[in-house]
Amino acid sequence: MIALSYKAFLNPYIIEVEKRLYECIQSDSETINKAAHHILSSGGKRVRPMFVLLSGFLNDTQKDDLIRTAVSLELVHMASLVHDDYIDNSDMRRGNTSVHIAFDKDTAIRTGHFLLARALQNIATINNSKFHQIFSKTILEVCFGEFDQMADRFNYPVSFTAYLRRINRKTAILIEASCHLGALSSQLDEQSTYHIKQFGHCIGMSYQIIDDILDYTSDEATLGKPVGSDIRNGHITYPLMAAIANLKEQDDDKLEAVVKHLTSTSDDEVYQYIVSQVKQYGIEPAELLSRKYGDKAKYHLSQLQDSNIKDYLEEIHEKMLKRVY
């Protein structure tokens, strides 16, 4: 008998998540309906719902609570994307126009708020105070991450610690919460809950570092946004930090000087120069950092009891660390 892949196993549950996402974004406001449908219909990998479901399936669980949790965390993620695109003035998201471009900035802000409110409303019936403490803290961290990102724009130098804090709040915290809340919903034992939570954190960190690498190495058709979007929006990420450090070791301070004087109105040639230097000097150390977190994630996964669900998590782990988009 051929074993199911994680996608085949999760497919009926992801279909249910998708159905409930569309139910959750219905409102009395035609404008919000259209804007929320715009972001939802642009697709997405549904990474967070997958981790909620698989973490919950490590033990017997109430599937309705798991679905609710998966839907709500995806709504939080969607809200953060809408707000991020507005803050960065990014025109594109997954190959489609961003909400603030397709509609307007006020609509984007209100749509993000609406999605957060729906996320909270959707899990209100879950009777577990620890669950709600974790969920609300996660939303706070995501909000702090948006403030971090605004504060760090065109603000070189950025410390390594500040970068790690930012990507934790931007990405890893939601994946960690997906694993943690899934385990909590299934009443998984304390030790296994710790390891699946840490797995979520580490793979989330690795995932975002890869995202930062791809921003320099991929192409617009694959990314659904222009190459070098991060630096064009003033975001100093690890590939650039590593490139600057490597060049300084060779007594070459030109890249650092360029980044220090970078503004939102800098010429396109300046950005092209930065991208070329990062490709040459910053990608390998960033890949090493991503693998470091990937190895930590693999360790925590190895501490879980053997099962088909663990195999699915290992499959996702391998795929996420080899992704090209």
From Swiss-Prot:
By its UniProt entry, which InterPro entries does this protein fall under?
HxpDPsynlarge (IPR054985), Isoprenoid_synthase_dom_sf (IPR008949), Polyprenyl_synt (IPR000092), Polyprenyl_synt_CS (IPR033749)
Species this chain originates from: Micrococcus luteus (Micrococcus lysodeikticus)
The protein, known as:
Hexaprenyl-diphosphate synthase large subunit ((2E,6E)-farnesyl-diphosphate specific)
GO MF terms held by the record: hexaprenyl-diphosphate synthase ((2E,6E)-farnesyl-diphosphate specific) activity; magnesium ion binding; transferase activity, transferring alkyl or aryl (other than methyl) groups
Q: How does it assemble?
A: Dimer of heterodimer or heterotetramer composed of a small (Hexs-a) and large (Hexs-B) subunit.
GN (gene name): hexs-b
Relay the cofactor remark from the entry.
Binds 2 Mg(2+) ions per subunit.
The record's comment on protein family reads: Belongs to the FPP/GGPP synthase family.
Keyword presence, Magnesium: yes
Concerning Pfam families, the annotation shows:
polyprenyl_synt
Q: Keyword annotations for this protein?
A: Magnesium, Menaquinone biosynthesis, Metal-binding, Transferase
Q: Where does Mg(2+) 2 bind?
A: D84, D88
Keyword Chloroplast annotated: no
Gene3D superfamilies recorded: Farnesyl Diphosphate Synthase
Q: Which residues bind all-trans-hexaprenyl diphosphate?
A: D84, D88, R93, K170, T171, Q208
Catalytic activity reported: 3 isopentenyl diphosphate + (2E,6E)-farnesyl diphosphate = all-trans-hexaprenyl diphosphate + 3 diphosphate
